[in-house]
Amino acid sequence: MSDDVNSSATSTSSSTVHFDDTPFEDVYEIETELGSGQFAVVRRVRDRKTGEKYAAKFIKKRRYATSRRGVTRQNIEREVRVLQKIRGNSNVVELHAVYETASDVIIVLELVSGGELFDHVCAKECLDEVEAAAFIKQILLAVRHLHSLHIVHLDIKPENVMLKQRGDSQIKIIDFGLSREIEPGAVVKDMVGTPEFVAPEVVNYEALSPATDMWAVGVVTYILLSGGSPFLGDNRDETFSNITRVRYHFSDRYFKNTSKHAKDFIYRLFVRDVDQRATVEECLQHPWIRGPEGNAIDIRKASCITISHIQSFKTRQRWKRCVELVMVLLKASKSSRRIGDGRFDEEDMVASCTLICAEEGNLRALHKLSALHKLLPNATRKSLKSSFSEPNGATAMHCAAKYGHAEVFNYFHMKGGNICARDDNGDTPLHVACRFAQHTVAGYVANEKIDVDSINKTGETALHCAVESADTRVVRLLLQLRPRLDLPNASGDTVLHLAADSINPRIVPLLVCLAPPLHLRNIREETPLHVAAARGHVDCVQALLDANSPIDAVEQDGKTALIIALENGNVDIASILITNGCDINHADHHGDTALHIASKHGLLQAVQTLCHCAVTVDSVNANKKTALHLAAHYGHVDIIRVLLLARADVTLRGDDGLTAELVAVAAERLEAHSLLKMVKSQEIREEYISQLYPLDTSLRRIKLKLLGHSQSGKTRLVQTLHSSRGISSFLESVTRRISDHYSPSSSMKDDGIHSTNGSFVSESNNNSSFDLAAAAGSKYAPPHSQYTRGIDVQTVNINGCGEFSVWEFGGYEPMHTCYDHFVGNADCIHLILYRTSDPTEVQYKQILYWMNFLKGRVTPFEPIGHCGFSSRRSKVIIVGTHATSSLFPQMNQEGEYVSSDIEAMLNTVRLRFETHFDMDHRLILLDATNPSCIGMKTLKMELAKCRTNILAKLLKPLAILDTVVNHLNLVRKKHANFPVITWPDFIQLVRNEINPLTGDAHCRQIVQQLQLIGELVYLRNDLCDADYVVLNAEWFGTHILGQLLSAEFLSKASPNGSYHTSSLAKIFPEIPEQSDLMTILEVLQLCAPDARTGAHEFPVFIQTEAPDSIWRPYSLKEKERDTVYGGVRILPMRGMERSLHSTFPRIQVALRRSINDYQPAKDTQLHQWSECSKLVSQDREAVIRMVGDAVEIRARGPSESATSMFYFMEDLINLVEHAAAEVGPGISLERHFISPKHLKEHREHPALFPPESMMEMQQRESLSVKGTQDEEELFTDVVCFGSRDVARHLTLGIDVGVADLQMASRCELACLLDPPHAMGRDWSILAVKLQLTDQVPDVDSTGQSLSRTDQLLNEWAIHHPEQASVGNLCRILVELGRCDARDALYRTVPLYVFAPLEDQFLLETNDSGVVSSCHSSSEHNPINI
């Protein structure tokens, strides 16, 4: 039991024991090992001064509270205190001294060298009871000494009764490791001792007492007299049963000659009741111990103990140990013998089993083996018989180190294992542990203060091995020991070379911190920078450069780090080297420069960077070839363009006499040859080059975008701004634009399109008529017949302001669904118009709508400015139209209309949106019919100022831009019927027809500038890689979108929104390929193909209302009872109401696409109606619909598939949120979960669980959440459909890291906490709460440019990542008294983050039939539910 039962940590005193920290080996010389235990080894030592010999017990300390290795300091101190207290008795081992090292406590005791008492008895020919009683009396005297001091030994057994010297009869009690100090009345319970010798109270876990030792004395006496163990059974359970029942007997075979006094002595000790058991004093007075009184005959002399019985006992013990040893060996080697891997050696079973246990980490077997045989931790295998075996010479410690078995390694070390042993490769265990990234073992060895710079046969130190393992923990550990960093291995590589070539880029910065030599070279003459440049880790290269590594050092072939980086395709590293000032014109031994290498390998970015840094472009190599020759030979046309722009000489010839053009011909590089041929002339080449340089002037125009509801005066304002000549000029320009670009076909006036048959009247003219009376009952009725259709685009030169591309966005609401493709850029001016004749409430709602519309469609930019201001605010001017003197009788000194009500309203709007928009503080009220009104002049002044400010921030136009603009007019005529081309076609158009040297970057800049001046529209295609360029924005906005989304078309459209491609020919007969137009409409996400019908579905056209029966209880009560419900409403953040209405058709498009993308969708059906969709997937169904301002999702399915229902719902939520984010990236969404209980009851108005309630529940660590109707439900039911498996994989919102906060959350906090607070509850006090006072000066130094709150949160996430969670931040905000900031955080953080369940769990589930483009998992696979 002493080996298998852990001792308790009962302290004997509250005082701390102090040990001598003098180096032990300075005082004593360590000699042979005398014995060992689990965590201790006893060795004979000799005092260096006196020569006196002692027994030193080396006890391994437990280093960590959670570790299982070693003995706790509390237990060691307890043993020392016991030994100190019991000094001075001749029958107890004497304490001499106690020392302490980093890993051990060494207890120095008197040397007891006489051996065990029983061995002494076995050596005698005979032994009578008098001698036996004398031995027992000495044990009793020792026990009396202990008990008088309230010490209980608890492990009295034959092995702990020793003779002081060989041949001497004086005994000593040893081993006080389990001893306790038990004061009278104290209750101490513990399972300690050796099974055969423990008392019943130990087995029954009852209070220990001095009587516990007396039971053990009885067992020792029984064995001494008979040679048999009184309670020993076939197994431990039987032994314990015998003890608790006090089941023993005096066999005639062994006790035939034993005196009755001896039997009575034993009988008095084997008493279950501790109060009735004989005490030590009673035992000393017992006749068998005391002997006869006076001259009485001593009957003990007549009783002679049969020595053979004791010898048999010892023999049985030895045989038992041998059998147990064989069993342990066979069991430990079972796996090796079964697979026959050659590790088990029958000729050396103990050594081979030791090695096997070391490899397998079988500490339990080692404990058993150690108890039966001396361990051989330094043994090695004789030969290699399999690939599994370790190298020759590998000891058990090498094996344990390789496989990371730290406890086994520690055990071997305590058993005398050589921690510095070397195998045949010269590796020590530290080398092996580091090579295999076993940081725990490496840490153990490192703490033993061994030579960390020891090298093996290949010159490697342990640090070499650690770096090769790429394990940062091991490297950090070794660096704490300050190893040498300049030692090379057999290849000449220092640890820095190896780190530069490691797969782990974090090692080089660690080494660089210790200032290693950076100039050392390996046998290839490479510095670490060369190696890092070849490997490709940017962080490594940067760290070496920051440490002043020689940047232009050359290796054996004359190559610098720059050339090596380019040879390996590491362009990012090449850019860093160039930025740090390396020699870009250096040539290697072959004459190749970095430009030659980059041109040869097609590294366009590198060539561009080198040319930008004025590299010598015509440098020749050993073959007289320039970079242009190499680019021509390998056909890198884009690089040829860059070299020509850098004015490379096209006439230079190589050693073969060929120019670059001829080289391209010889290599059959036709495109390269064509390009070089076109620029052969110096004059033409210079002209092309000059076109691709920016001009000194600004762009000719910018966009002016007008937004407002119908009848807000947009068209009339544009008319007035267009020309001082008034409406006749405007009508003339409209007529000209229509006649130039397209003409309405006659069929469009007579024949419309329908899913079956039908017609409608439609005209492309913006001012076409519409029968309002006929459409009075239609949901698509416009407010007036002359409403703007789509987006009217025209160029206007405003007198005194300059030229603008004016984009008038129609106010007709169905058109809003596609406006996100045309708004969102900050490099333009937005005019929001409202009618001053409308009631103030109407004005306010309309302005809020368009401000929110713009805010939602403008992507917020980093960094966050002071008070949450966006770094790039769009310019917005709010203009009141229809202003007359009758409405505004008061004017200011400049003659402008004045209105305190409107001024107050606009101030409210400015305060609400100033973080996102740059808004003018002047009140602009005008009459659009009067070009000379003061308000018009004010507007023009503001437009001129804004235009100047925006143009000043934009890049200067390329000289080629005007040429492209002029050429586009010709291209538009060529593509008049369908002015749309792909992006690759546009690039080829520019190169083939304008300038062949135009690169991709030039084309991107040209298109960007053409968009800024309103010449075309660039459509990004998420369906495939081919983006599109619309050459005529007016055609696109008015003729296509204005017609398809007009009231005329919508009122006659197919009720189910389904159209075949051929149907488009009836609307747009002039377009030759209707499939091209359908593709463009798909790119705009106005439609999606329906795989079942082969037609395209246009959700915006759908007029059919959803039936009332789409969400009713199941007719079968059993099915309804076994159904789980769930739901959520996705709302825009507070203050952005009605932001999702225009996005719902796009959500329906995304739903249809998801069904198409999911191939095995035969069991999945999607039905769509106006503002409602229903998805049925096998036995699950969901309804997605607009409810007020929210998109509501309700789902239900079988209760046994609750986990799959969560997946189903989660995918739908992600799909809706992703679709909404594509339309409005600035719309922050909230999830309001619906009561599953109320859904199951089919209540008309179910309770909701808003984000604040969900987050508050998490903060309280509650399991239930309270809804809006004050009813509580379990969080798992509300979110997880009752699935606890799902709940276990959720990361709650309070546990989300601050570093992962979305920008909306950060902006809200900045807006609330950046401004100074009257009570000081702002960012400065927050810094104190976050323990970031040291960072305050740096944060405060940024002034008004950056948000101090946002910077603080970033610092918190960096310096305290474990504490920087949303939950902790919310708690701190409450302590700060800023519940408003907490509530804002509650509304904007994710309520949970979901990690998908294990694959084996998912295999048991079915598929949902929904593909979410924002799925929680790392891969965009179909959802497995």
From Swiss-Prot:
ATP binds at L34, G35, S36, G37, Q38, F39, A40, V41, V42, K57. Its EC number is 2.7.11.1. The keyword Disulfide bond does not apply. PANTHER family: DEATH-ASSOCIATED PROTEIN KINASE DAPK-1 (PTHR24342:SF14), SERINE/THREONINE-PROTEIN KINASE 17 (PTHR24342). Interacts with ptrn-1. Disulfide bonds: none annotated. Keywords: ANK repeat, ATP-binding, Cytoplasm, Cytoskeleton, Developmental protein, GTP-binding, Immunity, Innate immunity, Kinase, Magnesium, Metal-binding, Nucleotide-binding, Repeat, Serine/threonine-protein kinase, Transferase. The keyword Signal does not apply. Belongs to the protein kinase superfamily. CAMK Ser/Thr protein kinase family. DAP kinase subfamily. It is an enzyme of class 2 (transferase). Pfam families: Ank, Ank_2, Death, Pkinase. Residues 28-289 form the Protein kinase domain. Residues 1308-1389 form the Death domain. SUPFAM superfamilies: Ankyrin repeat (SSF48403), DEATH domain (SSF47986), P-loop containing nucleoside triphosphate hydrolases (SSF52540), Protein kinase-like (PK-like) (SSF56112). It is found in: Cytoplasm, Cytosol; Cytoplasm, Cytoskeleton. ANK repeats lie at residues 392-421, 425-454, 458-487, 491-520, 524-553, 557-586, 590-619, 623-652, 810-841, 934-963. Residues 695-950 form the Roc domain. It comes from Caenorhabditis elegans. This is Death-associated protein kinase dapk-1. Its cofactor is Mg(2+). Negative regulator of epidermal barrier repair and innate immune responses to wounding. The role in epidermal tissue integrity and wound healing is established through the inhibition of epidermal microtubule stability, possibly via the negative regulation of the microtubule minus-end binding protein ptrn-1. In epidermis, prevents expression of specific unc-44 isoforms probably by promoting nuclear localization of pinn-1, which in turn may affect sydn-1-ssup-72-mediated regulation of alternative polyadenylation of unc-44 mRNA.
